[in-house]
């Protein structure tokens, strides 16, 4: 049975205009977006990429709403600069654009959206969501989203109940559309609202409400004006704050968050204590005046339920509440706070515990407040994972009853655990974490070793346990039968005895039929939960079965009658005394076992992916086979690609110029190379890099093939590294020249892989020693002193001869080498320039060795062709040509600065007023290594470069470095960097980074001194990096 049914037995919503009776709150929210906006950009989440927009995606693939046409829909990945696509799309449009995104992604949107300069408006539909790396759990993180909203200055609205999610979404859309801000955020419980199935009973305002609002709201209205008009026209009461409880309350709790608000509201409902509750619906802007009006005059204590990321610092909500009371003279009220982190597990008992810690006399009846709850536990790979959904579907058919379902996956416990919690009640209630159920069904005994199942069962409740081992021949009056024969942990038996929980064993082994076992588990549930007889159990099961099922009600009844007699056993209560007396023996040096978790640690939205795809092995082929495939391309699905082994788009370019720029007698070979890209369609931007797919020296490859005994014309088929089902066909010569790094440095795992192939025992022993800790010194000598290549190793170990098919898997592939582009395409539309240094050294044998890629490129003759690709970069010019540019670099790190200066030249030629350009460069000697020196001087004379600060470290007795040149111009750089909002770039090796960063801090410190303020210089540097005004391109 598909996972989709196990998590939602009612199926997907077919369209956005007519929602089903049951669904998730996220589906309800999505319908508002789909019906009221013209464009939607949805960003993927982790684990289940379309978690927050799967309905939007499905609806957009269909015809959509006939009367208005479907909105534009685009699904995107989360990355730096998120938001640029909708920002560009909305340019020139006056409609509101919807962005659907998980809360953890909002920091990536800040730079894109905080400076919207056109008329576009944005509604961010955000599910509070994050991932806790420490615990491996999925969390409801409101803090990250609220922090981003504050930086964007967007208003935020959050539903305080699942019964108002559509209305709040529509309100957020109205605020985004009509308020004087460029956007608003609908922030909701992303975790529970996407994974809880419940009745969709909300009465939604008519679609024309937005049109009506446009007629009565002044342009660029204030947030509260839009809110008030929305409530007035719809008749709703979606105010900033909602008060519940006693009007003479002495203690008032403040909550923010969808589930939190519902649970506290349910907890204090009907309580006679002097308790009040304020749910925050609008956290931003926090209206302090309105908040104070909701605080009863009798209030003595306010308790803020605040979320923080670290669990210690005061929450955002606490600071707002304290400020509101201070500004309105309510300082006699004490303010306390209960702080919780995003991974906090909310449940009725948790709420009771929190309230009781502030009001000891507080009591409430959790069972009556939260309906009847049940828990189903199973392995996430079980064929019976859908049992709970079948039960929920049957419960939903009862008149006058509501049912809610919340499913969870823990990919770690028991190698994959599934839990379904479902509640039936006379009114819709929240599903959090059931902590006191009268019945749990456990489908897999092994789960009891990983989770404290009994802890969430009420005293004198029941547990139905499915055993995959036969029960019928066991002595059920013996403790040993349960522990040794059925594998039930002793700790579990002790727990059920302590709480007097009834235990029923379902004999899953003897049932011997998975489909019938499912029927019987359902029947046991109906019997234990509601006391139904066989006839009524059959009736409930029959109602929930698919109409096409090949089974009759009579056969179900007949099977259940026998099953209850033969396959269900109740553990005798008389045995509980023996359970209580069990003494779990602990070995002498064994530590006290850790307590089992009570609740599932929700680590994913999907089952554990425990299947391993079988990867086909490389194989050799005859030329005739290749000829056959090329002759019948359609039949064999042959594709002809430039480099199918590479995931990026590639281009073939020609060398136009290749010249050395350092003297021939100088020990560093640095060269400038230009490629002709005419007709290739290749484009590049400032700051990007060119990936060179270099080849091995063909004559050296042929030498190796002859030595190894390989035929260069043989054909080898290698699985594509991105899609193992695709086979790439290469000749042996092609593979070793273009694909395999045969002259590269082998890693440790290569030596390990050679051991099985060594036929000589002495060589085998040497290889084995190399990969042990004792052989680390020799291995390092092989790699970093002798610089042995793959080819060298096969010479050193002549008995090691893997086959061709094995060679292509154990030799690492050639990697593309990336070089910063030294040209602007606006100035050189059909060229791309690079500045490269040839890496060389002399090994222990006296051989001159070279870096594979740099040497290959330096030897290219004019007219040579090679494969290249473009790599994006974080290095960009400031948004305005007027903003200054400060560049510092060493050696070939000057390459991107040539591109920047050319771009500034182009800007000036187009009539733009350009800002100051400072260039700081460094090398050892001016005569040998003043790279592009003549160009820099010419650009300075032309008024493009403002100042050149050249530091040639060895041309004078004292060493001079670029940071020294920077410090000589602190006044000018302060004006350029701080006053005129310039950008600072550092390119080249990593070692100058601390010194250059210190020089930049000196600039910031000078500004702070002039303004008479104190600045955290480290934080200021980080802010510059975040704003892309301090950019490091180092290697």
Curated annotation (Swiss-Prot):
Residues 648-879 form the FAD-binding FR-type domain. Keywords: Electron transport, FAD, Flavoprotein, FMN, NADP, Oxidoreductase, Transport. The keyword Transport applies. GO terms for biological process: hydrogen sulfide biosynthetic process; sulfate assimilation; sulfur amino acid biosynthetic process. It catalyses: hydrogen sulfide + 3 NADP(+) + 3 H2O = sulfite + 3 NADPH + 4 H(+). Binds 1 FAD per subunit. Binds 1 FMN per subunit. Its EC number is 1.8.1.2. It is an enzyme of class 1 (oxidoreductase). FAD binds at residues 684-695, 814-824. PROSITE patterns: FAD_FR. The keyword Flavoprotein applies. Present with 1580 molecules/cell in log phase SD medium. This enzyme catalyzes the 6-electron reduction of sulfite to sulfide. This is one of several activities required for the biosynthesis of L-cysteine from sulfate. This is Sulfite reductase [NADPH] flavoprotein component. It comes from Saccharomyces cerevisiae (strain ATCC 204508 / S288c). The lineage of its organism: Eukaryota, Fungi, Dikarya, Ascomycota, Saccharomycotina.
């Amino acid at each position: 049975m598909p996972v989709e049914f196990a998590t939602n037995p009612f199926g997907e919503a077919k369209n956005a205009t007519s929602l089903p009776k049951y669904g998730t709150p996220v589906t309800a929210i999505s319908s508002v977006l789909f019906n009221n906006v013209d464009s939607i950009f949805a960003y993927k989440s982790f684990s289940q990429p379309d978690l927050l927009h799967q309905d939007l995606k499905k609806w957009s693939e269909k015809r959509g709403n006939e009367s208005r046409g479907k909105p534009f829909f685009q699904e995107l990945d989360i990355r730096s600069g998120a938001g640029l696509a909708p920002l560009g799309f909305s340019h020139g449009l006056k409609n509101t654009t919807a962005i659907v995104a998980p809360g953890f992604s909002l920091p990536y949107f800040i730079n894109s959206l905080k400076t919207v300069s056109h008329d576009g408006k944005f509604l961010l539909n955000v599910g509070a969501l994050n991932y806790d790396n420490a615990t491996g759990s999925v969390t409801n993180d409101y803090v990250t989203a609220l922090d981003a909203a504050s930086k964007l200055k967007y208003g935020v609205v959050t539903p305080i109940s699942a019964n108002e999610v559509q209305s709040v979404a529509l309100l957020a859309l109205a605020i985004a559309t009509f308020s004087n801000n460029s956007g608003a955020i609908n922030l909701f419980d992303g975790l529970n609202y996407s994974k809880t199935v419940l009745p969709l009973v909300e009465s939604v305002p008519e679609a024309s409400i937005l049109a009506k609002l446009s007629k009565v709201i002044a342009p660029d209205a204030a947030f509260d004006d839009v809110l008030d008009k929305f409530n007035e026209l719809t008749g709703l009461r979606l105010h900033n704050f909602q008060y519940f409880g006693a009007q003479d309350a002495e203690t008032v709790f403040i909550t923010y968050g969808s589930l939190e608000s519902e649970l506290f509201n349910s907890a204090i409902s009907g309580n006679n204590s002097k308790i009040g509750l304020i749910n925050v619906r609008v956290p931003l802007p926090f209206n302090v005046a309105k908040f104070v009006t909701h605080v009863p005059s009798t209030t003595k204590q306010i308790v803020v339920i605040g979320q923080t990321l670290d669990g210690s610092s005061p929450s955002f909500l606490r600071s707002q509440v304290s400020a509101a009371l201070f500004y309105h003279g309510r300082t006699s009220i004490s303010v306390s706070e209960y702080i919780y982190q995003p991974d906090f597990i909310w449940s009725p008992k948790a709420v009771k515990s929190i309230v009781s810690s502030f009001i000891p006399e507080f009591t409430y009846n959790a069972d009556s407040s939260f309906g009847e709850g049940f828990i189903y536990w199973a392995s996430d790979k079980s064929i019976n994972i859908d049992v709970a959904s079948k039960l929920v579907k049957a419960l939903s058919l009862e008149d006058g009853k509501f049912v809610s379902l919340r499913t969870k996956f823990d990919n770690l416990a028991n190698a994959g655990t599934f839990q379904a919690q479902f509640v039936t009640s006379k009114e819709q209630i929240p599903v959090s974490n059931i902590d006191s159920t009268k019945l749990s069904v456990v489908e897999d005994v092994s789960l009891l070793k990983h989770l404290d199942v009994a802890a969430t069962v009420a005293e004198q409740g029941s547990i139905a346990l499915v055993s995959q081992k036969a029960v019928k021949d066991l002595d059920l009056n013996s403790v040993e039968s349960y522990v040794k024969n059925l594998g039930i942990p002793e700790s579990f038996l002790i727990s059920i005895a302590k709480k007097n929980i009834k235990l029923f064993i379902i004999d899953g082994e003897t049932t011997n039929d998975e489909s019938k076992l499912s029927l019987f588990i359902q029947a046991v549930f109906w019997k234990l939960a509601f006391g139904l007889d066989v006839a009524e159990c059959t009736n409930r099961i029959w109602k929930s079965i698919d109409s096409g099922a090949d089974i009759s009600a009579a056969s179900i009844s007949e099977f259940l009658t026998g099953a209850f007699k033969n396959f269900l056993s109740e553990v005798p209560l008389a045995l509980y005394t023996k359970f209580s007396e069990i003494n779990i023996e602990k070995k002498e040096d064994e530590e006290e076992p850790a307590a089992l978790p009570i609740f599932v640690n929700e680590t994913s939205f999907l089952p554990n992916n425990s299947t391993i795809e079988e990867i086909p092995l490389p194989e050799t082929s005859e030329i005739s086979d290749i000829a056959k495939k090329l002759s019948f391309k359609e039949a064999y699905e042959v594709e002809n690609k430039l480099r199918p082994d590479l995931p990026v788009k590639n281009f073939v370019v020609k060398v136009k110029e290749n010249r050395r720029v350092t003297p021939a007698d100088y020990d560093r070979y640095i060269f400038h190379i230009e490629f002709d890209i005419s007709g290739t369609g290749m484009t590049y931007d400032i700051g990007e890099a060119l990936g060179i797919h270099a080849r091995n020296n063909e004559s050296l490859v042929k030498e190796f093939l002859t030595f190894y005994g390989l035929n260069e014309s043989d054909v080898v088929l290698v699985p594509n590294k991105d899609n193992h089902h695709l086979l790439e066909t290469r000749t042996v010569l092609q593979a070793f020249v273009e694909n395999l790094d045969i002259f590269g440095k082998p890693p440790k795992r290569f030596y390990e892989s050679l051991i099985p192939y060594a036929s000589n025992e002495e060589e085998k022993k040497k290889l084995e020693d190399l990969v042990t800790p004792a052989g680390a010194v020799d291995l390092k000598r092989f790699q970093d002193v002798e610089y042995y290549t793959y080819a060298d190793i096969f010479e050193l170990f002549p008995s090691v001869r893997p086959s061709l098919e094995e060679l292509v898997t154990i030799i690492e592939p050639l990697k593309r080498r990336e070089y910063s582009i030294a040209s602007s395409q606006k100035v050189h539309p059909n060229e791309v320039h690079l500045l490269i240094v040839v890496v060389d050294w002399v090994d222990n044998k006296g051989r001159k060795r070279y870096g594979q890629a740099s040497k290959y490129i330096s030897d290219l003759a004019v007219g040579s062709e090679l494969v290249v690709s473009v790599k994006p970069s974080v290095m960009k010019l400031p948004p305005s040509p007027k903003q200054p540019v400060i560049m510092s670099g060493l050696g070939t790190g000057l390459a991107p600065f040539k591109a920047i200066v050319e771009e500034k030249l182009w800007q000036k030629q187009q009539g733009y007023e350009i800002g100051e350009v400072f260039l700081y460069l460094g090398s050892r000697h001016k005569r040998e290594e003043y790279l592009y020196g003549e160009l820099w001087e010419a650009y300075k004379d032309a008024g493009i470069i403002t100042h050149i600060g050249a530091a040639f470290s060895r041309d004078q007795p004292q060493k001079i470095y670029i940071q020294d040149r920077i410090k000589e111009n602190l006044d000018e750089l302060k004006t350029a960097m701080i006053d005129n909002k310039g950008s600072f770039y550092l390119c080249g090796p990593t070692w100058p980074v601390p010194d250059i960063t210190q020089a930049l801090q000196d600039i910031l410190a000078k500004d702070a001194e002039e303004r008479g303020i104190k600045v955290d210089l480290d934080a200021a540097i980080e802010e510059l990096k975040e704003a892309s005004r301090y950019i490091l391109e180092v290697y």
